């Protein structure tokens, strides 16, 4: 090995080929050679391949200094050995391992022998080997050079070209030598050619990490002339022509992403492209000249594929990295000219190649098959104008061809063949082409996009080697001809830029064909799409209120799949249209009631307060003003007179006498907040109210009757009517008619309320009633309220007289399932007896809705016990129409959905409370009788039902104590100033919304001349004079003319009860019927606030003036500790229209009324168990005892607040959406249910409840039961 290495070194020095080869480490070390210097690589032997230092650096320098003579002698001496080595190397180059020193020597000898053959005479070879070896050797060398003659560029020496190509011969070697070599090769082409096919291409492996060549096949020496080891460790791109490096790089970047999928790409998948590779500039090709020689490039077609490098190391030559890496495998095949002889004629079977250019003539695509025919690589032609490649003499023909192209372009896919024309190739010659032309026209713009020519060579060039460098000189063309050619080229380009016209017949055919296709498609489409698929599926009607996405609230998942299930009926209120109030409304319309009384001369009233003029009454009557907080202006006298103007009943001012007010029509008396205000007539109510007020005073007289009333009277369906009052209640006669009027109606109302949990809820009298003074003792008329209010009377068909018919009265009660009787539908009405028209009358007096005469008994202290009845037969028919009702239904449906979502969070307590139904009812009763503190006298009425007993009203004892505790004794009220307090309809259900569900409502005044309408939003019932409301067992201080509200008395303990004369439903009442509406059968909608959320609920106050207009008190009831401020408000008169939309903002209490009470969860009055569950942290958390008139007065009377729900959304919406006129027809679930509160607060409230129990005095609890239950 060492000897061979030394010999190799010597050969290298002698050859003076500027190459030093060493076999040590199987690496070819390269010294500074002329090739290296010219190629720009400048890599010396010190660089070494594979990072190994060269051991031949010093000898390399010496080798350059060797003289040529000595080297020639050495070569001659070694000629025989070299020749033998060459033959063996040529035959078995692929098989021999290149790691041995012998192989290196053989390669070196091969180079030397080739050089000697090229430079010396053939006689030297003949002398050593013989003619046969020489012929064989010459043949091999000739075949090795022959393929290069067609592929080498023009700069190659002429000696490498075939003779007869048409180029001059010359060069360093004698021509005879080459001719002989060529001829000898031709004689032996058969076997030699087969052998050379294997050597026609080479492969190399390149690392994608750094682009270094890791492996090459031995055939690279035959193809490019490089020794095999020359490329190892070199960058492949160094051997690529500069102009082709961008193409090579682009192919690499596009191929890498594909290769990274690795297994997904087939093994044989390749990308092919053409580049020029540098040839070896050894002595074999370039002779001995080193300086001044050009670098020659040869075209190759490269097939590129990616592989994953193997993990293990192979032979030293493999040079594979230890770590896994991507490898690029390139197989290079030389591209040779397709022409053998000059100007040869090709047959029709010659291959075609395609060139595509745009309308501007710019070439956009060239087939790789065109390289051998044109000599251009695809990247050489891309971006050039094809017009430059046409022969200038053929441009007119080319123009005709393109005109034909434009014509054929009218038909998609049309093609044609043109006459032959000349085309310029790379070596500067022209070839004759036959082309099949086609084009593509944009169907939208109708412009030519590109032209494709499929070319076939008809005649070859004069110079067969198409890769030869073209001559520098260009043919000279006359300037005139050049201008002409330029003009023709421009015309061609302009022609291609024009729009392609289409024949009209073609257009028509295409349109017809497309129309037919469209019609066929539509028929198929219609067959596929059936009508059933187009059906719009709407949810079931009762699903409208139960949205699945709304079922998840407050962490509770309660999808209501069975909406008729008993449980879901508790948690999910029925659809608005499912409520049975529609039936009652229809019955109301069928009864053809007269609810809008005609203006009549006011009856003479015996009260000084009635002295006000009719004009004053009219001015104060405006329903808008009355219902807004600002409406009712004027004194109580105005109210009284205004109400009396249209009252057909006499006002009984006698304290003892029983003034019988004849109730013409149905004067529904809804006693509110125990003021005993009898709203017999719409609008007259105020007068009644004032009467009621008087009653208040009377009530105190009635105190006596208080117990009685609540006792039997109330219980007695009829009794509770006027009877009770007349007899028991008014036994004392204090209340006389009034009591019966106001009280009764009050009591009654409250009765209904009180007795009917629901009733009370619907809240005519609501808790109020019960709380109300009326209910104080008067309330005792649960009966009263019971029977009367809801009294069939009120509702009673008779009552329905005008007022009875009132949807409200009759409806409210009637609708209540409890009161099976339609007439009785009134909560109190539910009592069959009440249905009697007369009773109704009596009750009307009592309940204010009776059409009969009401015995106005009782001293009306300070006022007229005015028993005013409105609704004379002269009045025009009601303006409520079914169309209006339908519209209302739709709006109510939407609003109920909204409120239902807001209140759903409170329904979770239903199940818990269900088990506590009895206890809850008892606790409610206890609350009604709370005797300590100012807050007592809360009366709860209304039907209290569960799934099983949804239509059965629960019986409840009436509060005999007047709930009008004087929380603020400092604020006295003039005795004759009856303050009309609206019943606060606080839902006892689990509804959490603290504002009225329907904040706005319409009021159709029955008597347009009524002085003023009460602001139904006012929650604080005005007590009658304390002496009247105070029972013996009530401990509230008796302050005459005290303007304390019933909520003052019952504030903390009051459970918001809503009283509406109507049927009880198993879910909380959603609507509140205003007393005025009940009295005059006018449509009035009162917002009903629902407690249960910490937000303070600003309850509107009722102007005192409006109270005097209606001799009916609405009992303000508070459902629980939820924070509710109830006040009695006085407002200025404001003219109102027939339809008046009242919003909670309008009901805001002005500061003029000092009787505002704040309820606190922990107040003295103990709420029921359900009420204990109310939010303890109410925004208004001040005790009733802390209240004083200054607090009430401190409020800015202009500070009008709208009801807002728990989310702060205002309920001040369209008035039509909030009609509570139908509140009495809404089913209600158990009224005592309220959202659960923290256990701590609940326990605290229970303690208070127990305290209330001990102090409560129930006089006739059995008589206080809801009369609906009896009926």
UniProtKB/Swiss-Prot annotation:
Gene Ontology CC annotation, any one: nucleus
Domain of life: Eukaryota
PTM comment, free text: Phosphorylated with a circadian rhythmicity, probably by the double-time protein (dbt). Phosphorylation could be implicated in the stability of per monomer and in the formation of heterodimer per-tim.
Subunit text: Forms a heterodimer with timeless (TIM); the complex then translocates into the nucleus.
UniProt KW Nucleus keyword: yes
Bias-annotated ranges (Basic residues): 65-78, 1025-1036
Name of the protein this chain belongs to: Period circadian protein
Annotated GO MF terms: transcription cis-regulatory region binding; transcription corepressor binding
PROSITE patterns: PAS
Sequence repeats: 657-658, 659-660, 661-662, 663-664, 665-666, 667-668, 674-675, 676-677
One of the Pfam families matching this protein, by short name: PAS
The record's note on its domains: The run of Gly-Thr is implicated in the maintenance of circadian period at different temperatures. Deletion of the repeat leads to a shortening of the courtship song cycle period, and thus could be important for determining features of species-specific mating behavior.
Biased composition (Polar residues): 1-14, 80-90, 746-772, 781-803, 864-884, 1143-1167
UniProt-listed GO biological process terms: circadian regulation of gene expression; entrainment of circadian clock by photoperiod; negative regulation of transcription by RNA polymerase II
Ranges for domain PAS: 189-259, 339-409
Record's function text: Essential for biological clock functions. Determines the period length of circadian and ultradian rhythms; an increase in PER dosage leads to shortened circadian rhythms and a decrease leads to lengthened circadian rhythms. Essential for the circadian rhythmicity of locomotor activity, eclosion behavior, and for the rhythmic component of the male courtship song that originates in the thoracic nervous system. The biological cycle depends on the rhythmic formation and nuclear localization of the TIM-PER complex. Light induces the degradation of TIM, which promotes elimination of PER.
The keyword DNA repair belongs to this UniProt entry's keyword annotation: no
Region: 8 X 2 AA approximate tandem repeats of G-T, residue numbers: 657-677
Start-end of Low complexity biased regions: 15-46, 1014-1023
InterPro entries, sorted: PAS (IPR000014), PAS-like_dom_sf (IPR035965), PAS_fold (IPR013767), Period_circadian_regulator (IPR050760)
Record keywords, A-Z: Biological rhythms, Cytoplasm, Nucleus, Phosphoprotein, Repeat
Ranges of biased composition (kind: Basic and acidic residues): 805-822, 831-841, 885-896, 903-913, 1257-1271
């Amino acid at each position: 090995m060492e000897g061979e290495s030394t010999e190799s070194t010597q050969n290298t020095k002698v050859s003076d080929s500027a190459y030093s080869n060493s076999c040590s480490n199987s690496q070819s070390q390269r010294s500074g050679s002329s090739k290296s210097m010219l190629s720009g690589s400048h890599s010396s032997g010190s660089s070494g391949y594979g990072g190994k230092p060269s051991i031949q650096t010093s000898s390399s320098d010496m080798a350059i200094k060797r003289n040529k003579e000595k080297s020639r002698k050495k070569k001659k001496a070694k000629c025989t050995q070299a020749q033998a080595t060459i033959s063996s190397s040529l035959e078995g180059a692929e098989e021999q391992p290149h790691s041995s020193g012998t192989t290196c020597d053989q390669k070196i000898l091969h180079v030397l022998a080739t050089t000697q053959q090229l430079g010396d005479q053939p006689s030297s070879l003949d002398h050593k080997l013989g003619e046969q070896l020489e012929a064989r050797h010459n043949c091999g060398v000739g075949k090795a050079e022959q393929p290069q003659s067609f592929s080498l560029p023009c700069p190659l020496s002429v000696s490498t070209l075939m003779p007869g190509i048409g180029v001059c011969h010359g060069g360093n070697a004698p021509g005879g030598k080459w001719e002989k070599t060529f001829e000898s090769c031709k004689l032996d082409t058969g076997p030699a050619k087969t052998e050379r096919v294997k050597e026609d291409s080479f492969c190399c492996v390149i690392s994608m990490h750094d682009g270094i060549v890791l492996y090459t096949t031995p055939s690279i020496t035959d193809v490019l002339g490089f020794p095999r080891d020359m490329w190892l460790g070199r960058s492949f791109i160094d051997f690529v022509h500069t102009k082709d490096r961008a193409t090579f790089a682009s192919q690499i970047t596009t191929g890498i992403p594909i290769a990274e999928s690795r297994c997904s790409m087939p093994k044989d998948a390749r990308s092919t492209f053409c580049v020029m590779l540098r040839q070896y500039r050894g002595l074999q090709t370039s002779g001995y000249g080193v300086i001044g020689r050009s670098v020659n490039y040869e075209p190759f077609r490269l097939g590129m594929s990616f592989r994953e490098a193997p993990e293990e190391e192979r032979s030293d030559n493999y040079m594979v990295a230890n770590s896994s890496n991507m490898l690029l495998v390139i197989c290079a095949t030389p591209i040779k000219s397709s022409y053998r002889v000059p100007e040869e004629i090709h047959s029709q079977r010659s291959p075609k190649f395609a060139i595509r250019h745009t309308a501007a003539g710019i070439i956009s695509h060239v087939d790789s098959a065109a390289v051998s025919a044109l000599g251009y690589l695809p990247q050489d032609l891309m971006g050039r104008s094809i017009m430059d490649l046409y022969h200038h003499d053929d441009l007119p023909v080319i123009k005709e061809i393109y005109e034909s192209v434009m014509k054929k372009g009218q038909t998609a896919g049309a093609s044609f063949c043109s006459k032959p024309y000349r085309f310029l190739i790379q070596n500067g010659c022209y070839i004759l082409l036959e082309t099949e032309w086609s084009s593509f026209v944009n169907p939208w713009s109708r412009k030519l996009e590109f032209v494709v020519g499929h070319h076939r060579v008809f005649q070859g060039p004069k110079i067969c080697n198409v890769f030869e460098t073209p001559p520098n000189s260009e043919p000279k063309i006359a300037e005139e001809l050049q201008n002409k050619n330029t003009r023709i080229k421009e015309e061609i380009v302009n022609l291609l830029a024009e729009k392609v016209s289409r024949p009209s017949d073609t257009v028509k055919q295409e349109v017809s064909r497309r129309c037919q296709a469209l019609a066929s498609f539509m028929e198929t489409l219609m067959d596929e799409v059936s009508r059933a698929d187009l059906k719009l599926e709407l949810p079931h009607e009762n699903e409208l209120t139960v949205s699945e996405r709304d079922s998840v609230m407050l962490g509770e998942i309660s999808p209501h799949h069975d909406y008729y299930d008993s449980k879901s009926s508790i948690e999910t209120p029925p659809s608005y249209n499912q409520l049975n109030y529609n039936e009652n409304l229809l019955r109301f319309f069928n009864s053809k009631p007269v609810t809008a009384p005609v203006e009549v001369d006011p009856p003479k009233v015996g009260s000084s307060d009635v002295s006000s003029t009719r004009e004053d009454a009219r001015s104060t009557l405006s329903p808008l003003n009355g219902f807004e907080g600002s409406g009712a202006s004027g004194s109580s006298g105005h109210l009284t007179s205004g109400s009396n103007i249209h009252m057909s009943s006499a006002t009984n001012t006698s304290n003892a006498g029983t003034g019988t007010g004849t109730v013409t029509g149905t004067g529904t008396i809804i006693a509110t907040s125990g003021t005993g205000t009898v709203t017999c007539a719409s609008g007259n109510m105020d007068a009644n109210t004032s009467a009621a007020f008087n009653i208040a005073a009377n009530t105190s007289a009635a105190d006596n009757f208080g117990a009685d009333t609540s006792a039997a009277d109330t219980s007695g369906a009829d009794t509770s009517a006027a009877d009770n009052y007349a007899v028991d209640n008014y036994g004392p006669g204090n209340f006389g008619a009034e009591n019966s009027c106001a009280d009764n109606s009050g009591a009654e109302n409250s009765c209904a309320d009180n007795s009917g949990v629901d009733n009370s809820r619907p809240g005519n009298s609501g808790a109020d009633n019960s709380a109300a003074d009326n209910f104080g003792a008067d309330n005792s008329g649960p009966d009263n309220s019971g029977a009367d209010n809801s009294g069939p009377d009120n509702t009673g068909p008779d009552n329905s007289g005008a007022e009875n018919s009132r949807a409200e009265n009759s409806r409210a009660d009637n609708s209540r399932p409890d009161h099976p009787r339609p007439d009785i539908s009134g909560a109190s009405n539910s009592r069959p007896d009440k249905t009697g028209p007369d009773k109704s009358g009596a009750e009307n007096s009592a309940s204010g809705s009776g059409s009969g005469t009401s015995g106005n008994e009782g001293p009306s202290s300070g006022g007229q016990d005015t028993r005013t009845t409105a609704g004379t037969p002269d009045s025009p028919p009601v303006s409520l129409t079914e169309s209006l009702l339908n519209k209302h239904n739709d709006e109510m449906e939407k609003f109920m959905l909204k409120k239902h979502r807001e209140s759903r969070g409170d329904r979770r307590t239903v199940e818990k409370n269900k088990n506590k139904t009895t206890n809850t009812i008892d606790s409610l009763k206890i609350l009604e009788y709370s005797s300590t503190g100012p807050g007592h006298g809360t009366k709860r009425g209304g039907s209290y039902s569960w799934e099983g007993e949804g239509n059965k009203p629960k019986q409840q004892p009436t509060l005999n104590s007047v709930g009008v505790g004087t929380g603020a004794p400092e604020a006295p009220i003039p005795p004759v100033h009856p303050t009309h307090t609206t019943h606060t309809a606080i839902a006892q259900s689990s509804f959490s919304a603290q504002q009225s569900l329907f904040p706005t409502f319409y009021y159709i005044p029955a008597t347009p001349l009524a002085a003023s309408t009460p602001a139904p939003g006012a929650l604080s019932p005005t007590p009658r004079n304390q002496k009247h409301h105070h029972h013996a067992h009530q401990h509230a201080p008796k302050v005459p003319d005290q303007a304390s509200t019933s909520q003052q008395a019952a504030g903390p303990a009051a459970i918001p009860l809503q009283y509406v004369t109507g049927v009880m439903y198993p879910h909380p009442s959603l609507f509140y019927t205003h007393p005025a509406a009940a009295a005059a059968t006018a449509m009035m909608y009162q917002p009903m606030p629902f407690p249960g959320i910490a937000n303070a609920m600003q309850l509107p106050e009722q102007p005192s003036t409006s109270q005097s207009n209606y001799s009916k008190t609405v009992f303000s009831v508070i459902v629980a500790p939820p924070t509710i401020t109830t006040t009695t408000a006085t407002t200025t008169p404001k003219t109102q229209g027939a339809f008046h939309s009242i919003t909670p903002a309008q009901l805001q209490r002005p500061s003029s009324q000092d009787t505002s009470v704040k309820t606190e969860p922990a107040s003295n009055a103990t709420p029921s168990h359900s009420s204990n569950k109310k939010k303890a942290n109410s925004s208004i958390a001040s005790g009733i005892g802390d209240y004083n008139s200054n607090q009430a007065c401190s409020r800015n009377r202009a500070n009008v607040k709208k009801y807002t729900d728990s989310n702060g959304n205002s309920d001040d919406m369209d008035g039509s959406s909030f009609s509570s006129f139908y509140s009495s027809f809404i089913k209600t679930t158990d009224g005592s249910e309220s959202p659960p509160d923290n256990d701590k607060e609940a326990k605290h409230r229970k303690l208070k409840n127990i305290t209330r129990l001990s102090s409560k005095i129930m006089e006739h609890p059995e008589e206080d039961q809801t009369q609906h239950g009896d009926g």
